[in-house]
């Protein structure tokens, strides 16, 4: 940035617009008693709003051509002739007045020294500062993402803003702010979302509730609002903005995905380690897990087969993983165990003699 700009010298603004489906999204008009064409209204979410164009700006140049003395129709024709993109040099009322007092002719060249000074830094120097300034830039960016408290007193025409709700997202939003209104003077902007009205949280409230809260404040209203970027930041932090965040510490976004993954893995492991198993079941499960990584596991299963067949037959893991030979052997043992034990002949004779 140039020294003059850093010292606070007023400068015009260059707004570059690309035509959208609904045009550029601003209204141009002339004012009685004033020379030139002025921006009357900037539609929310339009290319004009994204370019930085503001209601009340005076149009100085269109694509580098001065239009200060042209008629309304001539200016409109120039903008339409630009087809799908246009470059507008504008000044806000305050800057316009200061430049006139200084006797400075407003033109696009006023911005070029600033651009050259920004590009004059050699790449090596830029690389040197880049790593060191990155964290500071991020911190500065976080400091900017704060709610704003807009305090306004009702004027002859009210506060000078329109409130609306959006079906696609919850909350009450500022649709438009009238030029030179109490709302504009308070810093209220189009697309701001209302968080508090006169210190009362409006989260989850309906349109009628918010309107009633504003009217309930009498001739003064204090609106805590957030712009779109700040709103998204606080939602990532899972925190509702409040007046404490106007100058207090800001929350930090967090991600617990990895923590949840770790805890879920522990949840799967812990029951297996805590639930008591017989020695037979433990040996079987170890053999089964090794089977996925080794071709020798069947040999280990045969060698580690226990002598007790009644408990092994109740374990489904063993039944699913035994070899054919082991299965035949168990079936043979099972049939043998069902046969009646042989009777001692001496007892047999004794039994018959008793009958």
Swiss-Prot record:
Look up keyword Cell membrane and say if it applies.
yes
Cell location: Cytoplasm; Apical cell membrane; Cell projection, Filopodium; Cell projection, Ruffle
The record, for SUPFAM superfamilies, names:
PDZ domain-like
Disordered: annotated segments: 110-146, 244-355
Q: Where is the composition biased (Basic and acidic residues)?
A: 110-119, 127-146, 259-268, 345-355
What are the Phosphothreonine sites (modified residues) in this protein?
288
The membrane topology term of the UniProt record is: Peripheral membrane protein
Q: Which residue positions does Phosphoserine occur at? A: 2, 46, 264, 275, 285-286, 289, 294, 297
GO aspect biological process, one term: regulation of cell size
N-acetylserine is found on 2
Expression across tissues is:
Expressed in spermatogenic cells.
Instruction: Could you list this entry's UniProt keywords, alphabetically sorted.
Output: Acetylation, Cell membrane, Cell projection, Cytoplasm, Membrane, Phosphoprotein, Repeat, Wnt signaling pathway
Stored PROSITE patterns: PDZ
> Transmembrane ranges?
none
Against SMART domains, the record matches this protein to: PDZ
Q: Name one GO molecular function term.
A: growth factor receptor binding
Point to the regions of Low complexity compositional bias.
270-286, 303-323
Q: What is its main location?
A: cytoplasm
The protein's role, per its UniProt record: Scaffold protein that connects plasma membrane proteins with members of the ezrin/moesin/radixin family and thereby helps to link them to the actin cytoskeleton and to regulate their surface expression. Necessary for recycling of internalized ADRB2. Was first known to play a role in the regulation of the activity and subcellular location of SLC9A3. Necessary for cAMP-mediated phosphorylation and inhibition of SLC9A3. May enhance Wnt signaling. May participate in HTR4 targeting to microvilli. Involved in the regulation of phosphate reabsorption in the renal proximal tubules.
Instruction: Summarize the subunit comment.
Output: Homodimer, and heterodimer with NHERF2. Binds the N-termini of EZR, RDX and MSN. Binds the C-termini of PDGFRA, PDGFRB, ADRB2 and NOS2. Binds ARHGAP17, EPI64, RACK1, OPRK1, GNAQ, CTNNB1, PLCB3 and CLCN3. Forms a complex with CFTR and SLC4A7. Forms a complex with SLC4A7 and ATP6V1B1. Binds PDZK1. Binds the C-terminus of PAG1. In resting T-cells, part of a PAG1-NHERF1-MSN complex which is disrupted upon TCR activation. Directly interacts with HTR4. Interacts with MCC. Interacts with TRPC4 (via the PDZ-binding domain).
Report what the protein is called: Na(+)/H(+) exchange regulatory cofactor NHE-RF1
